[in-house]
C-alpha cells in the first residue's frame, strides 16, 4: 500500500521515512509522489481484516490508512465493492500526503516552495492515471494508457 506513517507513527528505523529523509535533505528532491493503485492488496487487507488476521506487521502497516476506512464507513450510499475500494485507495494516498506534512522538515520545505507533494492514483484495469487536484478536491484524469488484465476482487 502507498503509505507514509505520520511523524507520531514512524518507528526507528523506518525504511520509508529514511529514504524520504535522504532524498529531501541530501539529494534536495523537489517533488515527492505518493501513488496508489486499484486492486491494492494492502487496502484489501484494511477493508477485510480477516484476510490479514495474525499478520502483525501487515496489520500495523495498513492501519496507517485506517482514517480512510473510517471516512468510507461514515459515508452513506450503496456503492459497489469496487467503488468503495477505490475511495479507500484514494483516501489512503491523501492520508499519506497529510502524514508527510507532519514532518517539520517536509512542511517547512513545502511552505517555502522548495518541495511539492503530489497524489496520484493508477487504475490498473482501465489504464488511467489520475492526479489529485486541490482545486476540485478530486482525482482528475492525467493520462490514459493501455488496459491491463487484472483479477477483479
Q: Across the structure, where does each feature detected by a protein language model lie?
A:
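Conserved functional hotspot residues or short segments at active or partner-binding sites
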Residues: 34
Amino acid at each position: 500500500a502507498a503509505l507514509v506513517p505520520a511523524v507520531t507513527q514512524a518507528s526507528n528505523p523506518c525504511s520509508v521515512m529514511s529514504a524520504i529523509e535522504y532524498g529531501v535533505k541530501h539529494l534536495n528532491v523537489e517533488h515527492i509522489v505518493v501513488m496508489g493503485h486499484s486492486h491494492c492488496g494492502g487496502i484489501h487487507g484494511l477493508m477485510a481484516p480477516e484476510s490479514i488476521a495474525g499478520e502483525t506487521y501487515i496489520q500495523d502497516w495498513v492501519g496507517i490508512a485506517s482514517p480512510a476506512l473510517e471516512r468510507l464507513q461514515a459515508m452513506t450510499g450503496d456503492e459497489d465493492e469496487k467503488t468503495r475500494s477505490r475511495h479507500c485507495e484514494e483516501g489512503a494516498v491523501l492520508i499519506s500526503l497529510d502524514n508527510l506534512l507532519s514532518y517539520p522538515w517536509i512542511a517547512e520545505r513545502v511552505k517555502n516552495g522548495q518541495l511539492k507533494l503530489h497524489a496520484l492514483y493508477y487504475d490498473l484495469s482501465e489504464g488511467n492515471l489520475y492526479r489529485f487536484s486541490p482545486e476540485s478536491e478530486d482525482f482528475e484524469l492525467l493520462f490514459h494508457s493501455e488496459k491491463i488484465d487484472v483479477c477483479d476482487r
